[in-house]
Amino acid sequence: MKLNELKPATGSRSKRLRKGRGLSSGHGFTSGRGTKGQKAHGKTRLGFEGGQMPLYRQIPKRGFTNINRKEYAIVNLASLNKFDDGTEVTPQLLMESGLVKNLKSGIKVLGSGKLEKKLTVKANKFSASAVSAIEAAGGKTEVM
């Protein structure tokens, strides 16, 4: 057996049905749709439930999207242990080190984990627990 002699298993491949090509084809005239009725005449729109009140209209509208919402990139204290003692941690440094993918509206430092290094952290926002943990480790926080 050679690569050019390979053939699909018998019955595994079937010919495409060509509907509406004359009565003698077996799939002509109504093309397998039966006679008359809603399903024979055309397609119903997306979400149509046969005249019943559709689900998307039964469920009430809720909320809105605030166009002024600010989304901050989040950094936890545990990930700041990656830096050396006395380092000034800035948003640019966080981007270069791969801790933050994109800056969005800025950076927010949260207090999850334990900080063991003395760092100066510059960010747009800090949680209260993050500020106390950074200062307890001998570091400083600066709001940008």
Curated annotation (Swiss-Prot):
**Keywords associated with the record:** Ribonucleoprotein, Ribosomal protein, RNA-binding, rRNA-binding
In alphabetical order, the GO MF annotations are: rRNA binding; structural constituent of ribosome
Q: Which InterPro entries match?
A: Ribosomal_uL15, Ribosomal_uL15/eL18, Ribosomal_uL15/eL18_sf, Ribosomal_uL15_bac-type, Ribosomal_uL15_CS
Pfam families (UniProt xref):
Ribosomal_L27A
UniProt feature, compositional bias: Gly residues: 23-35
| Domain of life the protein comes from | Bacteria
Any one cellular-component term (Gene Ontology): cytosolic large ribosomal subunit
Assembly and binders: Part of the 50S ribosomal subunit.
Please explain the role this protein plays, according to its UniProt record. Answer: Binds to the 23S rRNA.
UniProt family annotation: Belongs to the universal ribosomal protein uL15 family.
Q: What is this protein called?
A: Large ribosomal subunit protein uL15
Q: Which organism is it from?
A: Limosilactobacillus reuteri (strain DSM 20016)
Q: What is the lineage of its organism?
A: Bacteria, Bacillati, Bacillota, Bacilli, Lactobacillales
